[in-house]
């Protein structure tokens, strides 16, 4: 039986959000579960594009769907800075009480906690769930926590479910990127194959650039990041890696400063920006004390 939602999900996982939206808007089904799943990826794509106001407007606050309620809460988290602290506390309470009702809700809870740089809580959010998206979330979190061996274990479980699935391939590429130096280029082959098969996306080019940096091919990294920026010049990960690439390619200081300024402007609450601002303030304090 054909998977009617395959293209919608696949475009989302690849970071091709406009294509996901296009497929979702064309989608037609009488099955309520299919329509709801379509809406989940449609609205998550709008959020990823910085248009969180759309799900906030279209998903009723009193929706009975646990998945859509989780999407709406994530949209509120991204759209309303004043609500972030309250939402974060609410998510942490749900994780602590094991009161997360669905895999999508768990993945979105983990996403919120990750964005708050609370990796351990994020892992707890998805720990009970065994679907591919939950396991892919675990892999990302474990790599972020520098626990590659555990991440490999999750990838093996994903491969047992479906080794050809896009999420399994992306998870394989991620753990390979941070493995033995002799195998890092294997990750580049995976990303390149996916680009050839499904088309280039901001996410795929960003990951290819990271592998290029790890293999010291700085010119290739710069080219890939420039292409990614043409697609989305506000993406936080692309901007962060552009800062790294500019420094490695020995660009003028004003180029690096421009990327930093843009990142600060677009993502003032990003963990990288918060850490940078703290270090910058500490440097200024030490410099001021030394002049006193």
Swiss-Prot record:
The record's Gene Ontology biological-process terms are:
endoplasmic reticulum to Golgi vesicle-mediated transport; intra-Golgi vesicle-mediated transport; protein transport; retrograde vesicle-mediated transport, Golgi to endoplasmic reticulum
* Keywords per UniProt: Cytoplasm, Cytoplasmic vesicle, ER-Golgi transport, Golgi apparatus, Membrane, Protein transport, Transport
Entry-linked Pfam families:
Coatomer_E (PF04733)
Please give the chief subcellular localization of this protein: cytoplasm
Compartment(s) where it occurs, according to its Swiss-Prot or TrEMBL record: Cytoplasm; Golgi apparatus membrane; Cytoplasmic vesicle, COPI-coated vesicle membrane
Gene Ontology terms, cellular component aspect? COPI vesicle coat; Golgi membrane; mitochondrion
Which InterPro entries does the entry mention? Coatomer_esu, TPR-like_helical_dom_sf
Q: How does it sit in the membrane?
A: Peripheral membrane protein
* Example GO molecular function: structural molecule activity
How this chain assembles, per its entry, is: Oligomeric complex that consists of at least the alpha, beta, beta', gamma, delta, epsilon and zeta subunits.
Family according to the record: Belongs to the COPE family.
Q: Give the protein's function.
A: The coatomer is a cytosolic protein complex that binds to dilysine motifs and reversibly associates with Golgi non-clathrin-coated vesicles, which further mediate biosynthetic protein transport from the ER, via the Golgi up to the trans Golgi network. The coatomer complex is required for budding from Golgi membranes, and is essential for the retrograde Golgi-to-ER transport of dilysine-tagged proteins.
Q: What name does this protein carry?
A: Coatomer subunit epsilon
Please give the organism: Caenorhabditis elegans
């Amino acid at each position: 039986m054909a998977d009617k939602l395959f293209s919608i999900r696949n475009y989302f996982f690849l970071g091709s959000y406009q294509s996901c939206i296009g497929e979702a808007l064309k989608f037609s089904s009488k099955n309520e579960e299919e329509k709801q799943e379509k809406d989940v990826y449609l609205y998550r794509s709008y959020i990823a594009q910085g248009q969180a106001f759309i799900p906030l407007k279209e998903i009723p606050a009193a929706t009975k769907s646990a998945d859509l309620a989780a999407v709406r809460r994530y949209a509120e988290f991204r759209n309303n800075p004043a609500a972030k602290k309250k939402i974060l506390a609410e998510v942490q309470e749900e994780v602590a009480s094991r009161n997360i009702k669905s895999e999508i809700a768990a993945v979105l809870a983990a996403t919120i906690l990750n964005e708050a740089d609370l990796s351990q809580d994020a892992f707890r959010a998805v720990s009970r769930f065994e679907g591919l998206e939950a396991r892919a979330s675990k892999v990302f979190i474990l790599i972020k926590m520098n626990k590659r061996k555990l991440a490999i274990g999750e990838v093996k479980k994903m491969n047992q479910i479906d080794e050809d699935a896009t999420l399994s391939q992306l998870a394989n590429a991620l753990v390979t990127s941070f493995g033995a130096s002799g195998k890092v280029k294997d990750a580049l082959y995976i990303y390149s194959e996916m680009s050839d098969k499904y088309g280039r996306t901001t996410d795929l080019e960003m990951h290819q650039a990271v592998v290029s940096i790890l293999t010291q091919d700085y010119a290739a990294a710069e080219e890939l990041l420039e292409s990614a920026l043409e697609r989305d010049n506000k993406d936080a990960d692309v901007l962060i890696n552009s800062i790294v690439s500019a420094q490695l390619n020995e660009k003028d200081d004003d180029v690096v400063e421009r990327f930093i300024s843009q990142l600060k402007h677009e993502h003032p609450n990003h963990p990288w920006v918060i850490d940078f601002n703290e270090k910058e303030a500490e440097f200024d304090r030490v410099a001021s004390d030394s002049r006193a």
